[in-house]
From Swiss-Prot:
Annotated function: Assembles around the rod to form the L-ring and probably protects the motor/basal body from shearing forces during rotation.
Predominant subcellular localization, coarse grouping: membrane
Name this polypeptide is given: Flagellar L-ring protein
Residues passing through the membrane, by range: none
Subunit-level organization: The basal body constitutes a major portion of the flagellar organelle and consists of four rings (L,P,S, and M) mounted on a central rod.
Lineage, broadest ranks: Bacteria, Pseudomonadati, Pseudomonadota, Alphaproteobacteria, Hyphomicrobiales
Family to which the UniProt record says this protein belongs: Belongs to the FlgH family.
One GO term of the biological process aspect: bacterial-type flagellum-dependent cell motility
Keyword annotations of the record: Bacterial flagellum, Cell outer membrane, Lipoprotein, Membrane, Palmitate, Signal
Lipidation (N-palmitoyl cysteine): 17
Length: 236
């Protein structure tokens, strides 16, 4: 029995040692290799977008249908091109709900009987009452405030059949022993990219924007993995 318990504890210790944070004790968090977050493959879900009709370009014309204007700098339109994503998120939301419900019910009835015989008299009576009372109250309030202003360069990783672009970009900034990571990905239209080769985040379809980090401060803010496991399986 002791051998089994020791084996279980050793397995748990080894599982915890495999954590990346364990390997970074006494050192700053390591940065990811350049280009590790880029994927140049198109997923099957993108087949829902229609194909772009082919346009015949005359050899003597200076106009390009993939550009919004003639006398402006070229913007990102091909795989491998780079454009800048302007992220300016300033959202506030407040929700408040209140519920009050009550119900009261009561009922009762009487029973009685009497009789007489040659030897004795008898009488019997009884009362029965019952009631119920239920009450439910609920009050909930949620407030959220988010503000984020960043510029990040993204790479065109794919071109859909209708001409829209798949973009993906990441940025890592390490300050002391804390690594801040910004990831952005989505689908953009070439015409939405302005003359400075910049696109706003609200022009990105299927946008995936994440801003987080890794390091000592993040580890302190997160509960230990053992406590997270107990919270997950605990019925109370």
């Amino acid at each position: 029995m002791r051998t089994r318990i020791t084996a279980v504890l050793a397995a748990g210790l080894l599982a915890g040692c495999q954590n990346q944070a364990f390997n970074e004790i006494g050192r700053a968090p390591a940065m990811s290799p350049i280009g590790s977050g880029l994927q140049y493959t198109q997923t099957p879900q993108l087949a829902m977008y229609p194909k772009q009709p082919r346009h015949v370009t005359n050899g003597y014309s200076l106009w390009n249908d993939q550009q919004a204007a003639l006398f402006k700098d070229a913007r990102a339109i091909n795989i491998g091109d780079i454009l800048t994503v302007d992220i300016r998120i300033d959202d506030k939301a407040s929700f408040e709900n209140e519920t009050d419900r009550s119900r009261k019910n009561s009922s009762g009835f009487n029973l009685g009987a009497s009789g007489q015989s040659q030897t004795s008299d008898f009488a019997w009576s009884g009362d029965l009452e019952y009631g119920s009372n239920t009450k439910t109250e609920g009050d909930g309030k949620t407030e959220r405030s988010e503000k984020l202003r960043l510029l990040v360069a993204a790479v065109v990783t794919g071109v859909l059949e209708n001409g829209n672009l798949l973009i993906s970009g990441s940025q890592e900034v390490r300050v002391n022993h804390e690594l801040r990571i910004l990831n952005v990905a989505g689908i953009v239209r070439p015409r939405d990219v302005d003359a400075d080769n910049v696109i706003s985040y609200d022009r990105i379809a299927e946008a995936r924007i994440s801003y987080g980090g890794r390091g000592r401060l993040t580890e302190v803010q997160q509960p230990p993995w053992g406590q997270q496991l107990v919270d997950l399986v605990s019925p109370l």
